[in-house]
Curated annotation (Swiss-Prot):
Organism: Stachybotrys chartarum (strain CBS 109288 / IBT 7711)
Function of the protein: Part of the satratoxin SC1 cluster involved in the biosynthesis of satratoxins, trichothecene mycotoxins that are associated with human food poisonings. Satratoxins are suggested to be made by products of multiple gene clusters (SC1, SC2 and SC3) that encode 21 proteins in all, including polyketide synthases, acetyltransferases, and other enzymes expected to modify the trichothecene skeleton. SC1 encodes 10 proteins, SAT1 to SAT10.
Pathway(s) of this molecule: Mycotoxin biosynthesis
Compartments in which it is found: Membrane
TM regions (residue ranges): 34-54, 78-98, 113-133, 145-165
GO cellular component terms, A-Z: membrane
Presence of the UniProt keyword Zinc-finger in the record: no
Major localization listed first in the record, in broad terms: membrane
Keyword Transmembrane: yes
Protein name as catalogued: Satratoxin biosynthesis SC1 cluster protein 4
Miscellaneous comment in the UniProt entry for this protein: Trichothecenes are sesquiterpenoid toxins that act by inhibiting protein biosynthesis.
Membrane topology of this protein: Multi-pass membrane protein
Amino acid sequence: MNGIYALQQTFVKFSLLALYHRLFWVNRHFVRSVWLVGIVQGCWGIAILLVHIFLCTPMEKIWTPWMVEGTCVDVNTLFAIYEALNSVLDFIVAGLAIWMLPSLQIRKSTRWHLAGLFVLGAFSGFIGIIKIVEAYDSAQRNFQAVIWNVVQMSISIICCCAPIYRSILPKMGMSSIPSWASWSLRGSSRRSKAVASTADGTSKFSMRSYQGEGKAGGTSVSGNWINLDGSSQRALAWVDAESHGKDQSTYQDIPMGRMKVERSVEVI
């Protein structure tokens, strides 16, 4: 269990550090800190894994300590050392995120939500301290250590998966956010109602068109711009439609009584 725990804690912190590097790579001092913490964490994970593999000499004594003579590492001392270092690394990783959080150009409410998640990551470090204190209670040491390991690993996974929560969970205290499904699929089904066919085979757009000049994202636009009211994002689209009402020479494969409409919509 402890060998798996060391690997899990190492890769969880690697994922968080990789996210930090991707977000704040322009800050050289911060990037150096990320690399330093990553190297220390990697050395910690490898060392703990090797120590648990070669915990006793000979190795058979790990599985049958009452049958094989040999020596083993003091488990309590080892536990206190690697849990203390792991807690310090938890606090450092959470502190790095909170340090750079004010530089993000996001809403204040979102900043508070992210800060709460990072504080939850720091709580993983406090769990490590609790494990050290209770490790010397030999009566329930093994049972409680397993429980605290599971709790600590679960909290770590919750924190490292934080970037995807916005797309799969509703906003806390706010209206529900769109589903993870593509908004363009929903928008296209709504925009399809904008095309109405007439008896002579021509097509008309019932959506509002921007005639003249307007602005979209700070740039001036003109022409047949339409507002994508059905979408979950503010955007304008240029619509270029052609109708083929009586030209039967080009579209001989269209059955009688039906009409073929071609549309090209470019979203910017």
